[in-house]
Each structure stands twice: as structure tokens, then as C-alpha cells.
Amino acid sequence: MRAFFAVPLVDSLRPALAAVQEDLRAVGAAVSWVSPDSLHMTLKFLGEVPENSRFDLRPPAPFDLELAGVGEFGGRVAWAGCRGALDPLRELAAQAEAAGERAGVPRETRPFSPHVTIGRIRSNRNLDKLRARMARWKEQVFGTWPVRRAVLFRSETSPSGSVYKVVAEYPCIAT
């Protein structure tokens, strides 16, 4: 199965990001927008792993993030940013990285950069317009994101895009 660890976005924040996507879509840039129902923060992409894979993940105590700001990575990914309790989030990402490594998945070479991918930029068409429109959202605070669990998702591709199915849940437990 093609799988990844993630923190699912809480439902209360989906409409705000859908509104951002709609605003950005208006500039006509070549972007494949992520369905609001599929928005999440990837902790570790595992790629293909055996169906019967089991992972040991022990999330920290529940914590809160703030979903804020919009930007892009290198003309390839449109994102919404996070701030707030980043230490427990980084701990959770490090655990996901270690769990993947124990399963034979190569370690990520780039540092963890907390974000929610809202779209994948396909070409430079109207990229300058997209960046200018993103600047409107740079300081926007979308709301509090209570992190209460991490999830192992299976990613299934279809003609209409990827579909994510929960394989396992790892609740945040206060110690």
C-alpha cells in the first residue's frame, strides 16, 4: 500500500482554506487544488509498504497549533502554514520518521516544514499573479487547530485525484 503519516485537519478549519483556494483559483494559475475534505499535514511520506505493516507511534500529549498564512515552496506547492506548539509537532514528525526508518523507508533529507498542502503548482502560468494573490493571505490567521491524533493513511489514486483511507490512528495521550 502507498502510505503516509499525517495529522488530519479539523473540520472547523476546512471552510477557511476552501475560501483561500477559491480566491487563489481566480488568478488562473496552473494549480491542482487539494479537495478540502483531504486536507492534512503530512508528517512522513512512506511510499509503498506491505499491507500488513505495523508502526509504533506514540504521540505526545494533546497540543494546539494555529493555522496561519499562505505561501508556496519553489513554485511547486501552495501551502497554509502553522505556528504555535511546534515542539510537540516536531517530536511527532520525528517519531513518524523513525517508524518509517524501522520499516526500511529512507530518511527524509529535508528538514520537517510544518504546512498543509492546499495545491500543487503544475507550471509557471500566472505564477506571479498567484504569488501576488497569496500575499493577501500571508498574515491571515485561520484558527486554532487542536491536535489530538496522528493517522496512518493509505493513498489510493483515481482519475479524480487521490483518496485517503485511515489505516491506523494514534491518539495523543496526556502523560
Functional labels for PLM-detected ranges:
Residues 1-175:
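Histidine-dependent nucleotide/RNA phosphoesterase domain, centered on the 2H-phosphoesterase fold
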